[in-house]
């Protein structure tokens, strides 16, 4: 891992609108990529961050530092990273709600290093993540909005109340409206919770399309799936949108944006990607 500077939030992307992995960052397609990736991940940024969290030292600078190391690790096993539309992350004066599809564990690790250098941010996340041994302390340190995923009405209340509270403090929220991680995108299973939160808080929505299935879903343990060396990792942020009326038009735009980006990327990456 690169040297960590206490209290300094790293910003390697600077004012770039687009980032694409280049030869110095990108490793060759790896043999046994899952073994190489997970051993480096657990012994590197995860262990380091858990130790800091146990001591009460998991602040934003540490969170971003670990996040950026995960980006480096996925590049080293031969997965090129592209991030488009980064100018839209800081295009609003105040906080916003990022609404994204949820494909794998990878975006949970990578997004802090992309977004936090521009603005304070946290996640809506399921309760099981904050109760994990060791890593749960990391999640709790981020002051997330916690949902149980068993009672939709209670989850909506938690997101609206907790989200408005954080947004008033200037903290943006990342929302994954799908009920579970999946490589497929179905607008019928992409709920309106992000749009509802933005409307209630009076803040813009920033749509985010992502393709992170280079980190697959495991059969026995979902978080430890196959690592598909050579498969690109992609993010694209759209321009911020204010919510008007009931938000149906904005919800439709978000779904169309994500669906069209995924279709384009799959075509570029190959039929079976």
Enumerate the predicted regions with their spans.
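A cross-family acyltransferase "interaction/gating" segment
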Residues: 85, 135-136, 172, 183-249
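C-terminal functional extensions of proteins
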Residues: 239-267
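Active-site metal-binding loops of divalent metal-dependent hydrolases
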Residues: 179
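Membrane-anchoring hydrophobic helices of lipid-metabolizing enzymes
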Residues: 1-95, 110
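Residue-level preference for the first positions of well-ordered beta-strands
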Residues: 95-97, 170-176
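Catalytic core of membrane glycerolipid acyltransferases/transacylases, capturing the structured
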Residues: 37-40, 45-52, 92-151
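Membrane-interfacial amphipathic helices and adjacent loop/beta segments
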Residues: 54-86, 119-161
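Hydrophobic/aromatic ligand-binding patch that stacks against planar heteroaromatic rings
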Residues: 114, 138, 165, 196-197
């Amino acid at each position: 891992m690169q040297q960590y500077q206490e209290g300094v939030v790293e910003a390697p992307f600077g004012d770039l609108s687009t980032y694409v992995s280049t030869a110095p960052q990108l490793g060759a397609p790896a043999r046994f990529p899952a073994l190489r990736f997970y051993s480096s991940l657990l012994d590197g940024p995860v262990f380091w961050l858990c130790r800091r969290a146990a001591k009460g030292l998991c602040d934003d600078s540490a969170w971003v530092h670990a996040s950026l190391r995960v980006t480096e690790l996925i590049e080293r096993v031969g997965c090129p990273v592209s991030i488009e539309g980064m100018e839209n992350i800081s295009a609003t004066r105040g906080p916003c709600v990022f609404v994204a599809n949820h494909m794998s564990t990878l975006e949970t690790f990578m997004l802090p290093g992309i977004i936090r250098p521009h603005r304070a941010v946290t996640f809506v996340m399921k309760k099981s993540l904050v109760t994990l041994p060791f890593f749960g302390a990391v999640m709790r340190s981020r002051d997330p909005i916690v949902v149980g995923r068993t009672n939709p009405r209670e989850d909506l209340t938690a997101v609206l109340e907790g989200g408005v509270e954080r947004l008033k403090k200037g903290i943006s929220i990342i929302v994954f409206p799908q009920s579970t991680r999946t490589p497929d995108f179905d607008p019928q299973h992409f709920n309106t919770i992000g749009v509802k939160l933005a409307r209630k808080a009076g803040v813009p929505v920033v749509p985010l399309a992502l393709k992170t299935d280079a980190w697959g879903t495991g059969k026995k343990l979902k978080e430890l799936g196959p690592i598909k060396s050579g498969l690109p990792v992609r993010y694209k942020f759209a321009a911020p949108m204010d919510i008007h009326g009931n938000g149906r038009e904005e919800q439709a735009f978000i779904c169309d944006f994500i669906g069209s980006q995924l279709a384009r990327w799959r075509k570029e990456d190959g039929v079976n990607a």
